[in-house]
Each structure stands twice: as C-alpha cells, then as structure tokens.
Amino acid sequence: ILSSPNALQDFHTKALEDYGITAFWPEAVLKEAKVKKENIAREKDILETFPFVTIDGEDAKDFDDAIFCKFSDTGFHLKVAIADVSFYVKEGSALDLEAAKRTTSVYMPKKVVPMLPEKLSNELCSLQPNKRRRCLCIEIDFDKDGHIKSYKFHRGIIKSVARLTYTEVENQLINGVEDSKYAGSLKAAIALFNKLIINKGYRGALDFTISEPFLQTTADGDIKHIDDRKRLNSHKLIEEFMLAANISAADFISQYAKEGVYRNHEYPESLKIQRLSQILKNRGINWNGSIEDIENISAFILKLNKREDAPILNMLILQSMQRAEYSTLNKGHFGLKFDKYTHFTSPIRLSLIHISEPT
C-alpha cells in the first residue's frame, strides 16, 4: 500500500476503516460545536499580564497547554495553563458523549482525526497566540532544588504571547535565550528544567532511548522516506512541566476529590523479567532481574545506551514492563517513580482527562 501513487491517502483510508474511526460528525455534535462567539472582553484576569507561551511541534494546531515561569525568593514559580475544554463541553451533552466514544484524537502522518470538532479543538479551546482563551491554571512553587512545595488550581483567561516550536526552543537552549517578551520566563524555565532532570535521575525514573519514526512526504502527499524523530531537550522540558502538573493534580484528587482517575503503572511481572534476563544473557549481558536489579533498572538502561544495540535493548526492556492503565484506585507509577499520578494536561485530545480534571 505504501508504494502506490496515492500511498498516504490509501493508508489513511485503510487505517480508519480497520480501526473503525470516523472522520464525520453527527449533526447534534456539529450543532453544539457552533458556539456563538462569546464576549469575554469585559472579563479581566491577572493571568493575562504574564507572557505565557505554547511549545509544540511544527504541525500542531490543538494547543492544550501554555507555560510561564519565573525565579522566586525561595526557588521557582511555574504556571501551567491548560485549555478549559469543560467550559464548552458540558457533561452529558452530544459533544461529551461523542468525545467519550472516540476517547482520543487520532494522529496519522499529515492527518488528524480530532476528538472534538475543529471549531473547538483548533480554535475556541486551543491556546492560540494573541487570543484570549479560557484555561484551568495550576500554579506550582518549587524550592531552589526543584522540589514541589505547594500548588493551587484556578480557572482564568490567558493570552499567549508566542507559539513556539520544539526546534525553536531547542536552538535557544543551545545558543542562548533571545530577547523577547518571554525571555525572562524561558530562562527561568530552563533553570527549573535542569533541576527537574537531576531529580528524575535521583528518583530512578525510566527514560528509554527509542526513536519515533515519521514519514517525510512531498507537497502532494507522496512518501519520500521514513526518518527517526529525535527527542530534544525542549521536548523533555515540556514533559517535566506536565509531569509536575499531573502529580499535583493526582495529589489534589487524593486529598480533596470524592472520585478521580489515576494513571497507574505497576511493578513488572516476574515471568517477563525472567525472559528479559535470559535474552540479555544470550547477548552477553549479566542482569539477573532481582528486586535490586529492577529497582535500579534506570541506571542499567543508561549503561546499555553506550552499546550499538542500545535501541533494541531499550525496546526489549520496555516490552518487559507492564502497560500503564487508568483506574479509580491509586496504585502508583513504577516507570515514573511517583506514588500517585494522573493525566489532566491534554483535554483537547483525550476524553478521560475530563474526569481527572481538578475542579
């Protein structure tokens, strides 16, 4: 199928058919999505005074999150603004039921089948630059070593000052932050990120070196070749900030919410660990899969990354882990090394997040 003249279009058609994904919307959903342009000009919000930015891929249109960071007397202050989808998608509405049915946006090469109609996903809910957008904001205070000291949630309105790409931010990470409205925020964000990465290592969180393939296509949609997408430090910066927001949300749910959804990742199963140990032994690698070995597996992965076959070994170890699952019961997250964890930072493209959202 990938060798045909219309390979990409054929792939899209077959993938949608095979997985029962529809690109069409029921009339009731489209009707609800035609939200009258609301007048929020009179609503003033202190959040608008902060130079929030979004950092996403070059092709992104649904901007779920925006960040602002600054140095504080005690360390760092981070604000993470998350698109307030629940303002437009009411519980039990046609939009809500359709999102629950789809569960997630589907991303394919050069095509996205959104969970919500584009009027919402790419416009009203998307934290576009220079446009006032409703959000759920979490403000997190860190000490000088990057440990969370306190947090608070509140709804508000932001006006992002820039739509940045991972490549643009990576260049500034390497060459220095450029003069801009957000320069001070980005400098503080980089400093906080460096602390969080150190803490991640101390925590023993898993960090696999696995490339992500993506298709390079012509303007007509013909496939030229398949490349490996490199994971940049700018990706990791946003990942770490979203992790901080998500563990704060999980803590909030555990303390104050009557119910909520956690993202659990349980301890590896013994049979899979035994198989992994044997495979590694066949490759001349001594790893017994003891409790001590498993607890220190992140350090083991770092050693393996010096080998030529590191990508293969990373994949083998990943396949030996249990799959992360959602549950109303908290069981902790083995891979991230968190006592509790949830997802609430991608509401435009993941329906379950609406249940986990702190309110």
What residue ranges belong to the model's regions?
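Short, surface-exposed charged micro-motifs
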Residues: A66-F68, E139, F214-Q216
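Conserved nucleotide-binding/hydrolysis micro-motifs of P-loop NTPases
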Residues: V85-F87, K144-G146, Y267-E269
